[in-house]
């Protein structure tokens, strides 16, 4: 089960779009919008991911432009409302992009929002410390109708193995206890399930 997927890339009329999302807060927090928009850590992380995605897109497209920067969205989840900040980045693909679609997607993987920056170094560290394969977690899925493409990243992922439910969700480098608290918080939005969850 995948929930709250994040857009990977969208291709429409020969243009490629990406919407990096960094920065989320519970809408019920007092002055939530202001806290999210002025938080130095959130601003820095957002700037970093926008720069990374611009760089990634420049490898497979031209005329890269950030058309919207750190805009605020209000999202209704199953149990509450949240605010998050995103940006919109656009590039122009070559006229024959359809014949190069596999190379375009592979050239953008892994998603910048998953690995962060610097990309090559971070991916190397992840490969060294992770204990096993991720499977579908943090991969992408989508559809291509012959003209346009929509795709998304599996950023929160629930997998059933036998009688066990394995929940996968990531986060940036932080203090381990705060990361674990955050991971536990996100499980509140999981479907009701009477068995044990394993947070991985």
Map each language-model feature to its residues.
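Extended alpha-helical targeting/anchoring segments
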Residues: 1-200
